[in-house]
Amino acid sequence: MEKKRTLSVNSGNNELIPPQPPSSPKTKNSLNNIENNECNNNNNNNNNNNNNNSNSNNLNNSNNNNINTSSNSINSSNSINNSIDNIDNKDNHQQKYYLPPSKMNSSQEFQSYLTPNKNNNNRNNNNRNNNNNNNNNNNNEGTIQNFTSRMLNSIIMYMIRPFLVGASASFGISIGMFYFSPFPPSFLPSSPS
């Protein structure tokens, strides 16, 4: 004798399915279908949980990566600032041993050269700017000189030189014509006969 199996499965309307005797094959099939549906529901729930876990992992990984990259960029900027500070400190250390020229006699100016401060840095920056301005002026003078020399060369090559060549050629041709003509002028010697 088979025992009666009673299964209570929640349907869409939250209603309990009443127990049925397993005498007919239809009831057996329905019970098997109910068990299969339960298994499928469990599998679907597991899949959903896996998907949720994978999504959360993706979010965590992406957030962590973004945070790490931003922290790396911040660290790189800090290293740049530190290197600039080190350069400034080296400049200041060298300025401590720099003596002023002989024309500076006051104690304040002497002290300003011995102790690095903002005024000293400003003085160095002004010197750099003056050097840059001098270089720019020299470059401008060089370009002006090059321009004038090119203009003079072009004038000589394309205006004066052809005139000189043409004048000399015409003068030579005219002298030759007079020299070999049957009636030479009186100021030229007679042509050889």
From Swiss-Prot:
It is a single-pass membrane protein. It is found in: Membrane. Residues 1-144 are annotated as: Disordered. The chain crosses the membrane at residues 158-180. Residues 29-86, 119-140 have a biased composition (Low complexity). It comes from the Eukaryota. GO terms for cellular component: membrane. This is Putative uncharacterized protein DDB_G0286829.
